[in-house]
Amino acid sequence: MSTTLSQFYYNISKKDLNMMGPNTLKLLEELLSNMKIGKKGLRILDLGCGNGLNSLYFAKEQGATVFATDLWISASDNYNRFKTWGVEDHIIPIHANAQDLPFSNDYFDLLVCIDAYHYFGTTESFFEDKILSLIKPGGYALIAIPGMKQQFEGQEPDLVKEWCGEEISNFLTVNQWKQIIGHSDSTESVQIQQMNTFEEAWQDWFDTKHEYAMRDQQFFNKGLNQYINFISIIVKKSEA
């Protein structure tokens, strides 16, 4: 995904007010820079798709069939949006809970989950049982999540506790995620690291002037960014 494409889709997201947080397209761009998608026409699960901007990219630019799945955005709302974008024949809107996804095992070439996985995937068995099982042998899971730069062990700064609220236990470090999603007989490779797109993705969110973005920016102005980061998780499933 080139810088020009990234800017093109960011312009779409600004115009239609579809951003719901840090720019998922910028995070996706970094994830894809570490791998090659390969052939056109892949079957992709966009898990926690929100308003479907990443689904739009895969449908229009990669010719993929995308199952855009979200718990908080209705399938009807997303379907109407996809019709407006002219991609309703390539994106299937699904309303579902990540704990009980209605898909067959070994079904997807690629699973993408950006800024959502930390809400439901922090138990050690979840990835192996609920996520990896859906991916075809040789396929990939691409995950980007907000996290912590260091582990505080119950002594989080007040600023962090105020921003995270009751969800503070969902924000983990790179090392904690390595313990949760480690290598297994079912994986060929697992890469977990801090992302470089942190500042840019957040700034795009602040630039929308959304009321929630303005609240987040106030926390950043107080120094929140010294504690949090974005973490990438790239897993390739074993061929057999």
Can you say where each PLM-predicted feature lies in the sequence?
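Class I SAM-dependent methyltransferase Rossmann-like catalytic core
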Residues: Y9-T24
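A short SAM/SAH-binding and catalytic strip from SAM-dependent methyltransferases
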Residues: L110-T123
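Conserved alpha-helix/loop element of class I SAM-dependent methyltransferases that forms part
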Residues: G21-K40
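Conserved Class I S-adenosyl-L-methionine
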Residues: Q191-A240
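A short glycine-rich, Lys/Arg-flanked "PGG" loop and its adjoining helix->strand segment in the class I
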Residues: E124-Y140
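A short acidic, Gly/Pro-enriched loop at the edge of an enzyme's catalytic core
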Residues: Q99-L111
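Class I SAM-dependent methyltransferase SAM/SAH-binding core
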Residues: L45, N51-D100
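Short, glycine-/aromatic-enriched active-site segment of Class I SAM-dependent methyltransferases
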Residues: N11, P146-E167
